[in-house]
Amino acid sequence: MQPTNERNFDMSTLEKPLHIDIPVKLAEVKIAFSVPALAFEGDLPACVFHLQLIENDIADWNAKAQVIAVFHTNAGHVTLNNNAYNTERNVATGNPYKVLVSDLMKRGVHFELCGATAKVHNWGNEDVLPGIKINTDAIARLTQLVQEGFVKISE
């Protein structure tokens, strides 16, 4: 490999061994993701990366799973269809997250939008992507899920 001034983030070029000290394998997974705002890993929302990661784990474990992602506050726009997204974000590009959301839904993740967030932004049911459910409000829904035995992950 030739020396360069550019940083190389291609992890596959690193030949360092990695020993997992605490291997995890679960038979059942019940997770509720609370997503009030987007934090990014590069250009990918961290919550999407984490949802992909746990879905990969669930598949590897062949685990029984319920994964629910509740979008609210400053992240509700992730659940919008192209027209509503364009209006909300003052862009003409459409929702850049729709394919990621659709892929995760196909893998079993349930997406919900906070009803209180929708009301504040004047979004109706016709404004969300297909398959998105609208709950009463995020706090009530997350409380319900925790009381039902879900582990709450705060993004």
Regions found by a protein language model. Give the residues of each.
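Secreted/extracellular ectodomain signature
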Residues: 1-155
